[in-house]
Amino acid sequence: MMHLPDRLALARSIRSSTVAPLPGRYRLPVAAVLPVGYLRLLLPSHRYQPGLPARTLPLYGYTAAADLDGQVVVAASRSDDFAPWMGPRPTRSRLEQEVDRLQREQPRSRVVAQLSVCALEHNCLTAQNTFFGRGEGALPTSAACNADCLGCISLQTDSGTPASQPRMGRAPSAADLIAVASQHLNRAQAAGEPGMVSFGQGCEGEPLLRERELLEVATELRRQFGSATIHINTNGSRPQALRRLFEAGVNSCRISVFSFQQELFAAYYRPRGYSIEDVMASCRTAVASHAQLTINLLTFPGVTDAPDQVDLTVSCLRELQVRQLQWRSLNVDPLWLLERLPHLEKGVGLERLMEKVRVSLPGLAMGNFTRPLAGSALP
């Protein structure tokens, strides 16, 4: 649970349906932060407190919470239970040992240096996987980006709140990336896993901006590990670069989308030199290249479930032949974000959106985690 400072908790009157601040000096607005594998359905009901400066909240997925017979309940839905992500993790001491091991093996690696911070200080599970040689391994690639997303977790330019996973300062070489990926895939496959590594992590910019280096990495990894899943998380801004990466050996991609509508897309991403049409083209490129295509839908109650957004999202998912849809709660100060987006019609509710997607697209897998291509079927 988290306190929302400088804000008032709101409540709706049962009799009049009016909304007003809760009376009482000690009535504080709070929100829940959900564990992985759960999707936020409602925002906490609150507003700015008059007369106080509106400090921007840190980057969390603030979720409505309530008291029900003395128990805290939250407005959330289970979105995934993929065992490799939901099971028990190795101990902290084991993690520290593995980090120390890889630092000694690759003392000058920028990738190892970045992942060490992510694993130990930010508790990034994908970074930790890379040291344990299990599951999806992280390959942070780019220090630059061609967007200035309102909810960017690696670089905040104007919100006044710190990034939750500060961006890597210097981009690694192709040799660095190959060395880290190879040790991860060797260990994973020796343990009987299909092996998976991913470009594009929360602590970096846009990996497609490093096309030349990634082409070299993908080519070498595909030569060494014929059955591995080589995945990229991307904003989909450069479809031709993505096509060349598929030709080099990348066989899976996850493209993040806040909205398929250009006005809302541009308001959130603040892109430099690309549009939603380029993102759509990247999706089509993935399908044409026979790569696994996943859409990472950044959801925000009252926006994602606006009636026109619901219809457009379902239509685009159908047209693009998406294999998996990942429901992702957008981590951002709710009031701060809404002040920067176009006004939308009242939302129908995320549960109704999810049900419409299930009914309209029965073959579409839905979840929260990307699956490796070999040895793991989508739900």
Predicted regions and their residues:
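Core AdoMet radical
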Residues: 136, 140, 156-180, 184-217, ...
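Conserved strand-turn element in the central/C-terminal portion of the radical SAM core barrel
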Residues: 270-272, 282-309
